[in-house]
């Protein structure tokens, strides 16, 4: 794989520091779910279902809050949003070890709304720092950074929770959120290009002028992508449990993450690549037959490699589509909607695929994940064709 495109992006001013900062910012986000689950189960004596309710409330809060935080960034810049979210996240996670379950359930949704938006911030900063011809490479690099954080963050959360205590782990997450917010506030990376910043500020555009059919299609496909990914993980875990090989779950997930990172590396390095919709279809189709070879564990891991090679490219292409379709003045809100779409997909994937497996077998979970992805892709295609037949009014301003 030629690495020159990545080297050229890394030579751009501000890019290496921003990628490193956003990688660190994502670590507490990737660790918080599993750490809070362990705390609810081990320290509060509740079941996994009770822990899942808190996770669901947090996810709903994040989905509701992401576009609102994005709008705040569009109107007032990065610092007010980072200060608000940083203080709220730090306070919530520092207090979490000392709250009863009922209180955690009540505050989970508002806390989710005010989570530091590391993902959308990373995409906005890269869009501001990187010229359009190089953005696919930059977004692919961001996806590889995300994969790495998902390999490290949960492992750190589990390690600290089991070797020390969940109280120490949750407190560490709170401190990390506060430190990340402080560094982001001090660094104040740009969220608009130099030309966009120099242009005179205009009134906020009504959402109907920029939330066009192609952008809605891109968001639907984003929901489908994370639906497939979450459904596949749940199906893989169920298959390993059914074959008595659940101890190999970590290895299988690691193989999936590495395959995704390799796919992202290739996607960002080649001169031309597939767009979001074909990648989404490829992601969905490749997971359909996995259930035919879901044991032993090493064969399952190998069967999941082709599908995961399309994972990071699909997510990177989603960011590329959203950044291209959203006007600069509402880019933060659009990136927030992208965050909401991905969280909705994650929230839908587990229960839908789980329901299918409860009434059949683990192998059908992979088929359900792929079929669901194709359904969302079909909706995206229909919206794109509607845009061709009936032009949506262009954004003004």
Language-model features, listed with the residues they occupy:
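Helix-loop boundary and gating motifs at the non-cytosolic
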Residues: 2-60, 209-254
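Helix-loop junctions at membrane interfaces in 12-TM secondary transporters
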Residues: 96-108, 292-303
